[in-house]
Amino acid sequence: MSSPLASLSKTRKVPLESESVNPGRRGIRVYGNEDEVDMWNDGQDSEEKISLPSCYGGIGAPVSRQGPHDSELMASMTRKLQELEQQLQAQNDEMLSKERKILDLEDLVQTLQQHQNNAALQRQEELETQCIQLQRQIGEMERFLSDYGLQWVGEPMDQENSEEKTVSENDERDWMKAKKFWKPGDSFVPPEVDFDKLMASLQDLSELVEGEAQVTPVPGGARFRTLEPIPLKVYRNGIMMFDGPFRPFYDPSTQRCLRDILDGFFPSELQRLYPDGVPFKVSDLRNQIYPEDGLGQFPGEGRVVGRQKMRKVTDRVEETSGSRMTAEQFLNRLPKCIIRQGEVIDIRGPIRDTLQNCCPMPARIQEIIVETPALASERQRSQESPDMPMPLLSMLRIKSENGEQAFLLMMWPEDTIGDVRKLLAQARDMDSAAFEILSTFPPTVYQDDTVTLQAAGLVPNATLLLRTRRALLSNPISRPGSLP
């Protein structure tokens, strides 16, 4: 049985019009629209046959049999076309909806990409700013370390990587707090202490501030108080400052303290209490070992297996003597000199001479007051108008090369190093180019005669040293830590 489409593909042969069949009726149109087909179907009430030529044979058939079949076929095709048109319209609507959704998604993606780009640029700018800030801080810290002759070393990268591998992920945050930062004690090893150099450095530091007075606040004002030496005991295995506790050499804080002293500086741990330095009263006990367990020596005789007796330990730690004031401590409590009506009156000298006969005294340092323009002006001011406030002055105490003499100079802050050198040369009756003026805290050699005392940091008072000129240096004022 053939399909309706197959029947449509067949060419229908229309018979020729014959005037003899029905001359008064128009010829039948086989193909037309649905209205024509319906009109054609309505007019087929009677079984009317179309006469065909004899050449078609038996193909000719009554119109009443062929008409309904073509009408159903056309109606079916019409319905299918309508369904296809509806499907096509629905698909077109769906495509338009999807296109609109795609456009919306593209706009959203573009907006997100732009936001991400802006966030990335902002983060990049923040990181660059932070990097510049950290680089500036690192530069400042490196310059600070170089001022003291130090250099940052750090840790090897392989060591840091090995430490990071051994730490678990759960303890990573704790490790960041405990191990990420450098600890000064981790870089120090127990040193071999040079006791002779340590004693010499302590003596130099004590001589530098010997007899200095410190401003102490009192009710209603302030007064000068002579610094008392700090008791310092040096044992074979550590030191003891003040009244304890004992500090072994392997302790990081002790190593830092010894390093400061050996480098010619006062310990940094004493800077808050004594910003200008403090003398030390050193007890050399290098031949004794301090018991680190805090227990004293066994008082009786010890016994071991195989021996009857064990000799008593002889290197006992000496007991702390009572706090008895010596004559030198008593003199240090007194002011060195006072100014009355323009005259500098020595206070310690007569009392020292009185005490010299009754108790042994160390060798006295001869103090020489150098006549300066500032001293003469201050003497005149105190006589003419004693009620006027005292102007800003610089009190210099300069020790000679052998330490037996100390020159006291009252200078203006505007005076220069050259003025000090000329006054010292006149007082000593020698050439000004034969000696150098230096300070040990910080180590500085003053060679530029044009530098003022204010610029050199020698106001309001300072303690300096003299030494024989060794060689001419290229820099006028050496940086701290460069003292030859």
From Swiss-Prot:
| GO terms under cellular component | cytoplasm; cytoskeleton
Q: Which residues form the UBX domain?
A: 389-466
Note whether Cytoplasm occurs among the keywords.
yes
Keyword Magnesium included in the entry's annotation: no
Taxonomically, the superkingdom here is: Eukaryota
Pfam name, any one: SEP
Give UniProt keywords alphabetically: Coiled coil, Cytoplasm, Cytoskeleton, Phosphoprotein
SEP domain: from which residue to which, for each copy?
A: 227-291
Residues annotated as coiled-coil are 69-147
Q: What InterPro entries does its record include?
A: NSFL1C_SEP_dom_sf, SEP_domain, Ubiquitin-like_domsf, UBX_dom
- Do you know which PROSITE patterns this protein is assigned to? SEP, UBX
The ranges of region (Disordered) come to: 1-28
Q: Where is this protein chiefly located?
A: cytoplasm
Q: Which Gene3D superfamilies match?
A: Phosphatidylinositol 3-kinase Catalytic Subunit, Chain A, domain 1 (3.10.20.90), SEP domain (3.30.420.210)
Q: Where in the cell is it found?
A: Cytoplasm, Cytoskeleton
SS bonds (residue pairs): none
Q: What are the Phosphoserine sites (modified residues) in this protein? A: 478, 482
Query: Which CDD domains does the protein's record reference?
Result: UBX_UBXN11
Summarize the protein's role.
May be involved in the reorganization of actin cytoskeleton mediated by RND1, RND2 and RND3. Promotes RHOA activation mediated by GNA12 and GNA13.
Q: How does it assemble?
A: Interacts with GNA12, GNA13, RND1, RND2 and RND3.
**Protein name, as recorded:** UBX domain-containing protein 11
The record lists the organism as Mus musculus
What gene name does this entry carry? Ubxn11
